[in-house]
């Protein structure tokens, strides 16, 4: 094969690989998003002070989703985050929020990679991932220590395949060995893909925030801690 023919052959392979990889992606899909939905009302309009107990930027993302949902909740008049609440802010409740997320892959991803690549399973099904979120909520009266943390679990079942994973999984079609390389690639595909997290967060943002916000309002109804009028408003440090 002369030089020009070799260049043309390599260019064709590169084009095929890029086209196949880009076509074999699967948009983020949260299969059980509908499971985490609840509606609630409160007998009065609440004012809530939030204490951010997140310990990482990722946890803070989920905390912000909760804050956003409370800010538009029909049972909440006002919500502020400590210690930035105004000195004259007198909340009905103080709620400490600590979200924790655990992301996991699945051994099913091995079989999606091989022999699944033959049917482009990674494109029409996506790889299988889980995101187990546990949000710890502690309710208290202003000026008192928070009560015991109450965990709220939201375990999400998702499907996703980005360009990178689609490219390597599809490589079984254009690499030597009739997909033998996929037998090795499959082990790498088993683990969770961190690149899926931003798309997952965007998809659950509204539903997760609303679910936790409703859980907080339910806590105030189930175990009401009526604000003592003698308690001074929270200062900038709570």
Language-model segments: what does each one mean?
Residues 1-24:
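Sec-dependent bacterial lipoprotein signal peptides
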Residues 23-87, 186-194, 214-238:
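A structural "domain/chain start" motif
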Residues 29, 45-49, 78-80, 90-98, ...:
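Ser/Thr- (and often Asn-) enriched beta-sheet segments in non-cytosolic proteins
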Residues 54-58, 62, 125-129, 192, ...:
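Extracytoplasmic/periplasmic, Sec-exported soluble proteins
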Residues 64-116:
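Short, solvent-exposed, polar/charged sequence segments at loop or secondary-structure edges
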Residues 94-149, 156-174:
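Surface-exposed short loop/turn segments
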Residues 140-153, 198-237:
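Extended amphipathic secondary-structure runs
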Residues 167-210:
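Lipid-handling modules and contact-site tethers
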């Amino acid at each position: 094969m002369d030089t020009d023919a070799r260049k043309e052959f390599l260019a064709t392979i590169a084009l095929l690989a890029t086209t196949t990889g880009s076509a074999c992606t699967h948009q983020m899909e949260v299969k059980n998003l509908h499971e985490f939905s609840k509606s609630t009302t409160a007998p009065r309009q609440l004012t809530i002070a939030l204490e951010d107990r997140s310990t990482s930027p990722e946890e803070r993302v989920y905390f912000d989703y909760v804050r956003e949902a409370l800010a538009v909740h029909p049972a909440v008049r006002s919500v502020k985050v400590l210690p930035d609440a105004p000195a004259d802010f007198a909340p009905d409740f103080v709620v400490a929020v600590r979200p924790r997320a655990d992301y996991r892959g699945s051994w099913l991803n091995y079989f999606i990679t091989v022999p699944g690549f033959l049917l482009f399973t990674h494109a029409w099904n996506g790889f299988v991932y889980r995101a187990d979120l546990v949000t710890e909520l502690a309710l208290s009266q202003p000026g008192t220590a928070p009560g015991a943390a109450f965990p709220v679990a939201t375990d999400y079942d998702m499907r996703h395949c980005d360009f990178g994973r689609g490219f390597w999984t599809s490589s079984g079609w254009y690499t030597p060995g009739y997909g033998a390389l996929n037998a090795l690639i499959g082990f790498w595909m088993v683990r969770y893909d961190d690149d899926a997290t931003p798309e997952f967060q965007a998809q659950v943002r509204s539903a997760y925030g609303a679910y936790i916000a409703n859980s907080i309002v339910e806590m105030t109804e189930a175990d009401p801690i009526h604000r003592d009028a003698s308690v001074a408003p929270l200062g900038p440090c709570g």
